[in-house]
Amino acid sequence: MPGDDDYLPDGTELLQITGNPGVAAAARVGDSLLGDPAAATELLLDMVAEGSARTVPEPMARPRELPQTPSSPLTPPEVYATLSRVRPPDAVIVNESTPTTAQQVEWLPTVRSGSFFATASGGIGWATPAAVGVALGDRDRGVDRPVVGLIGDGSFQYSVQAIWTAARHNLPIVYVVMRNQEYSILKSFAVLEETPGVPGLDLPGLDIASVARGFGCRAVDVETTGDLEREFKAALSAGTTTVIVVPTEPQKAML
């Protein structure tokens, strides 16, 4: 049977706090404490000294190059590089353009604590209402910062009604919808599982901007990096929720 040394680096101790006896019994390494994780977390927070948080390091420099003439439609790196030039430093990123997450992290990185939100895996349609939740939470806490939702056109269809709530409350959200006219992540999974050609994964003909206007949002279609930069700046000062729709090249997800 493998021992602790096969899973943990030398000198590392692992303590698991769980309310599930089965999970505690199944732990391969370390010790398990059976109890209320929420109560334990509150007690642990009381033990953390003020000022102990380390400074977030700057992102590592990476050799990057975009084409001198922007593509048509734009590539996700071109979209993210454009947004990186005009995004306010305190802006929040809520990401559910799942196939392009790695490119977003590279070209539009976040370095401030509490400024990046994304689902770990699984469900589709999380980020559109999550951006509403972040903005409402900021308002309740008296925090004034823009929220940027990076959403794929497929993900946007699952919970589009959330933008009605955003518009009703005049939340400072800028949704940038990457319109590649397909469920890229599902196509990538189909290839991974050796089941290509799954029907129903193409999304042609969607007029997302008109749908967004129907829910009360300000909405625009853009084609170029210049259009995107101009409309994003306008959205930051619009005083309401804006949906910017950007045609992009389909990307194979990094699974």
Regions found by a protein language model. Give the residues of each.
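Glycine-rich, acidic loop regions that bind phosphate or pyrophosphate groups
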Residues: 1-58
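Thiamine diphosphate
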Residues: 8, 24-26, 32-34, 41-42, ...
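Generic enzyme active-site microenvironment
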Residues: 16, 94, 150-151
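Generic detector of well-ordered alpha-helical packing
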Residues: 19, 96-97, 154, 246
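Short, flexible loop/turn segments with low-complexity composition
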Residues: 52-63, 245-248
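Active-site diphosphate/adenylate-binding microenvironment
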Residues: 57-142
